[in-house]
Amino acid sequence: MLTIEDLKLKIDNNSRLLGLDIGSKRIGISICDDKRTIATPLKTVNFTNLSDFILELKKIIDVNNIKGLIIGYPINMDGSFGKSAQSINDKSKIIDKEINIPVSLWDERLSTSAAFNISSQLDVNISKRTKNIDEKAATFILQGAIDYLNN
Protein backbone atom coordinates (compact mmCIF):
# COMPACT_ATOMS: atom_id res chain seq x y z
CA MET A 1 0.00 0.00 0.00
CA LEU A 2 1.08 3.53 -0.70
CA THR A 3 0.80 6.79 1.14
CA ILE A 4 -1.44 9.29 -0.60
CA GLU A 5 1.70 11.23 -1.61
CA ASP A 6 3.24 8.12 -3.22
CA LEU A 7 -0.05 7.34 -4.96
CA LYS A 8 0.04 10.82 -6.50
CA LEU A 9 3.44 10.02 -8.01
CA LYS A 10 2.24 6.68 -9.42
CA ILE A 11 -0.82 7.94 -11.30
CA ASP A 12 -1.13 10.53 -14.05
CA ASN A 13 -3.46 13.52 -13.99
CA ASN A 14 -6.09 11.79 -16.11
CA SER A 15 -6.61 8.77 -13.87
CA ARG A 16 -9.96 7.57 -12.62
CA LEU A 17 -10.00 6.43 -9.02
CA LEU A 18 -12.35 4.32 -6.92
CA GLY A 19 -13.22 4.99 -3.31
CA LEU A 20 -14.28 2.30 -0.84
CA ASP A 21 -16.09 2.51 2.47
CA ILE A 22 -15.67 -1.01 3.83
CA GLY A 23 -18.13 -2.04 6.50
CA SER A 24 -18.83 -5.37 8.14
CA LYS A 25 -22.02 -5.92 6.10
CA ARG A 26 -21.80 -3.57 3.12
CA ILE A 27 -19.15 -1.85 1.03
CA GLY A 28 -19.85 1.53 -0.50
CA ILE A 29 -18.10 2.23 -3.80
CA SER A 30 -17.58 5.61 -5.45
CA ILE A 31 -15.84 6.70 -8.62
CA CYS A 32 -14.36 9.93 -9.92
CA ASP A 33 -14.16 11.40 -13.39
CA ASP A 34 -10.95 11.08 -15.39
CA LYS A 35 -9.94 14.67 -14.54
CA ARG A 36 -10.25 13.81 -10.83
CA THR A 37 -12.52 16.73 -10.02
CA ILE A 38 -15.67 15.12 -8.63
CA ALA A 39 -16.50 11.85 -6.92
CA THR A 40 -19.90 10.25 -7.39
CA PRO A 41 -21.58 7.24 -5.79
CA LEU A 42 -21.28 4.07 -7.85
CA LYS A 43 -22.90 1.29 -5.86
CA THR A 44 -23.21 -0.54 -2.57
CA VAL A 45 -22.42 -4.24 -2.41
CA ASN A 46 -23.29 -6.66 0.33
CA PHE A 47 -20.14 -8.00 1.94
CA THR A 48 -20.09 -11.76 2.37
CA ASN A 49 -16.39 -12.52 2.04
CA LEU A 50 -13.29 -10.76 0.81
CA SER A 51 -12.57 -13.18 -2.06
CA ASP A 52 -15.96 -12.60 -3.68
CA PHE A 53 -15.66 -8.85 -3.18
CA ILE A 54 -12.21 -8.79 -4.81
CA LEU A 55 -13.62 -10.57 -7.88
CA GLU A 56 -16.34 -7.94 -8.17
CA LEU A 57 -13.82 -5.15 -7.53
CA LYS A 58 -11.58 -6.42 -10.36
CA LYS A 59 -14.53 -6.28 -12.76
CA ILE A 60 -15.35 -2.72 -11.72
CA ILE A 61 -11.69 -1.71 -12.14
CA ASP A 62 -11.51 -3.23 -15.64
CA VAL A 63 -14.84 -1.87 -16.90
CA ASN A 64 -14.14 1.67 -15.66
CA ASN A 65 -10.40 1.87 -16.45
CA ILE A 66 -9.55 2.60 -12.80
CA LYS A 67 -5.93 3.55 -12.04
CA GLY A 68 -5.99 3.82 -8.24
CA LEU A 69 -7.98 2.79 -5.18
CA ILE A 70 -8.69 4.88 -2.08
CA ILE A 71 -9.90 2.95 0.96
CA GLY A 72 -11.46 4.73 3.92
CA TYR A 73 -9.42 4.21 7.09
CA PRO A 74 -11.46 4.48 10.30
CA ILE A 75 -9.07 6.25 12.62
CA ASN A 76 -10.52 7.07 16.05
CA MET A 77 -11.37 10.71 16.74
CA ASP A 78 -8.33 10.99 19.04
CA GLY A 79 -6.05 9.77 16.23
CA SER A 80 -5.58 6.28 17.65
CA PHE A 81 -6.17 3.03 15.77
CA GLY A 82 -8.83 0.67 17.09
CA LYS A 83 -10.20 -2.70 16.03
CA SER A 84 -11.99 -1.23 13.01
CA ALA A 85 -8.80 0.36 11.72
CA GLN A 86 -6.91 -2.91 12.17
CA SER A 87 -9.62 -4.81 10.31
CA ILE A 88 -9.54 -2.35 7.40
CA ASN A 89 -5.74 -2.42 7.37
CA ASP A 90 -5.78 -6.24 7.15
CA LYS A 91 -8.41 -6.28 4.37
CA SER A 92 -6.62 -3.49 2.49
CA LYS A 93 -3.36 -5.43 2.47
CA ILE A 94 -5.12 -8.42 0.91
CA ILE A 95 -6.88 -6.22 -1.66
CA ASP A 96 -3.55 -4.54 -2.48
CA LYS A 97 -1.94 -7.93 -3.19
CA GLU A 98 -4.81 -9.06 -5.41
CA ILE A 99 -5.32 -6.06 -7.70
CA ASN A 100 -2.91 -4.44 -10.14
CA ILE A 101 -3.41 -0.79 -9.25
CA PRO A 102 -2.01 1.40 -6.46
CA VAL A 103 -3.94 1.37 -3.17
CA SER A 104 -3.92 4.05 -0.49
CA LEU A 105 -5.74 4.49 2.81
CA TRP A 106 -7.55 7.77 3.53
CA ASP A 107 -8.69 9.03 6.93
CA GLU A 108 -12.44 8.54 6.93
CA ARG A 109 -13.30 10.17 10.25
CA LEU A 110 -16.83 11.52 10.10
CA SER A 111 -17.44 10.36 6.50
CA THR A 112 -20.62 8.43 7.28
CA SER A 113 -22.03 11.17 9.50
CA ALA A 114 -21.10 13.81 6.90
CA ALA A 115 -22.86 11.84 4.17
CA PHE A 116 -25.90 11.46 6.42
CA ASN A 117 -25.92 15.19 7.26
CA ILE A 118 -25.64 16.23 3.63
CA SER A 119 -28.63 14.04 2.84
CA SER A 120 -30.60 15.68 5.64
CA GLN A 121 -29.74 19.14 4.32
CA LEU A 122 -31.16 18.06 0.99
CA ASP A 123 -34.38 17.25 2.85
CA VAL A 124 -34.16 13.54 2.07
CA ASN A 125 -36.29 11.40 4.38
CA ILE A 126 -34.60 9.12 6.90
CA SER A 127 -35.19 5.84 5.04
CA LYS A 128 -33.68 7.23 1.83
CA ARG A 129 -30.77 8.71 3.80
CA THR A 130 -29.78 5.36 5.26
CA LYS A 131 -30.42 3.36 2.07
CA ASN A 132 -27.31 4.47 0.17
CA ILE A 133 -25.25 5.77 3.08
CA ASP A 134 -22.30 3.46 2.32
CA GLU A 135 -21.75 4.66 -1.25
CA LYS A 136 -22.28 8.25 -0.11
CA ALA A 137 -19.63 7.76 2.58
CA ALA A 138 -17.33 6.27 -0.09
CA THR A 139 -17.97 9.38 -2.18
CA PHE A 140 -17.09 11.65 0.73
CA ILE A 141 -13.86 9.64 1.27
CA LEU A 142 -12.88 9.74 -2.41
CA GLN A 143 -13.70 13.45 -2.76
CA GLY A 144 -11.42 14.26 0.17
CA ALA A 145 -8.61 12.25 -1.39
CA ILE A 146 -8.96 13.76 -4.87
CA ASP A 147 -9.13 17.27 -3.42
CA TYR A 148 -5.86 16.53 -1.62
CA LEU A 149 -4.29 15.03 -4.76
CA ASN A 150 -5.25 18.08 -6.82
CA ASN A 151 -3.62 20.56 -4.42
Predicted regions: what they are:
Residues 1-18, 25-151:
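Phosphate- and other anionic-substrate recognition elements at nucleic-acid/protein interfaces
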